[in-house]
Amino acid sequence: MVDAATLEKLEAGFSKLAASDSKSLLKKYLTREVFDALKNKKTSFGSTLLDSIQSGVENLHSGVGIYAPDAEAYVVFADLFDPIIEDYHNGFKKTDKHPPKNWGDVETLGNLDPAGEFVVSTRVRCGRSMEGYPFNPCLTEAQYKEMEEKVSSTLSGLEGELKGTFFPLTGMSKETQQQLIDDHFLFKEGDRFLQAANACRFWPSGRGIYHNENKTFLVWCNEEDHLRLISMQMGGDLKQVYKRLVRGVNDIAKRIPFSHNERLGFLTFCPTNLGTTVRASVHIKLPKLAADKAKLEEVASKYHLQVRGTRGEHTEAEGGVYDISNKRRMGLTEYEAVKEMYDGIAELIKIEKSL
């Protein structure tokens, strides 16, 4: 049973949300009926509904407002997660199944911008959760340390282009820290959304960063997800970037079992990343299209692309440079998600050239 203090917090949180003019998906789908059906439930990791909704209650202007404290939460609190997933992921219904993992034929992708006129850099990332561990809010300090140990020893076995160094955040020297900041590799303690979700406990225990010698392959350990794997480089050679990520993920998967669900695909802390978990993006200069926002948005929505400012969410495009990525992560394969970005960017470049 859920204890009285937690129930009290849940009731207070529900009242606060209900009285607010929050536009979040949490507010939209957490009806009294759903709330009453779920408030007494717990996962085997001990998570309650409160662990899922507290960030959205605290930050009423969240877009989504819900996180999964562990892999089981998606099943135990399905009455709330399912409609939110359906709303966010273009009608991915309760009865739908995410397709099995498929990286596709890497060779069919190419360089988006061989002349280097438009694409500044290219990046593909995915998220993974380690089986047998809850997500951030429910991890103990001992588990954080144990996970970091597993991850660093696994990564030390990577070879060839992926070979590199693991830097624990605990006890990191000022020089190393500065170097990682200069490289834009260092992640900071979570923002207020993650803080409110209790995703930053025991910081910096168990957190670390790995990168290969060329600084083109990066692994974040215990930032928002257990693992974030990132492949990136300057220019528009998506094939090279994608190929490197696929190799890295496959190598690591041989040694670390990942949380996967038949219906939802790979499991992540935030439901927006479920499924393929893949975000393929470019920093791209589109000075002419920048002057015609409507046209830019029209092409973006046709190819399911998300357009952000230069420094990611909630920022401006500096000097006409946009961060553009695939929006869809669920109900399609990894290859399809990346190919959608590839086709959309190719189209944007074609239009930019014609203006």
From Swiss-Prot:
Catalytic reaction annotation: L-arginine + ATP = N(omega)-phospho-L-arginine + ADP + H(+)
BP terms from Gene Ontology: phosphocreatine biosynthetic process
Domain of life: Eukaryota
UniProt cross-references to InterPro entries, sorted A to Z: ATP-guanido_PTrfase, ATP-guanido_PTrfase_AS, ATP-guanido_PTrfase_cat, ATP-guanido_PTrfase_N, ATP-guanido_PTrfase_N_sf, Gln_synth/guanido_kin_cat_dom
Molecular function via GO: arginine kinase activity; ATP binding; creatine kinase activity
One of the record's GO cellular component terms: extracellular space
Cross-referenced SUPFAM superfamilies: Glutamine synthetase/guanido kinase (SSF55931), Guanido kinase N-terminal domain (SSF48034)
Keywords per UniProt: Allergen, ATP-binding, Kinase, Nucleotide-binding, Transferase
Residues in Phosphagen kinase C-terminal domain copies: 118-355
Broad class of enzyme this protein falls into: transferase
EC number(s) from the headed UniProt entry: 2.7.3.3
Phosphagen kinase N-terminal domain residues: 6-90
Residues binding substrate: G63, V64, G65, I66, Y67, E224, C270, E313
Family, as annotated: Belongs to the ATP:guanido phosphotransferase family.
Protein name per the record: Arginine kinase
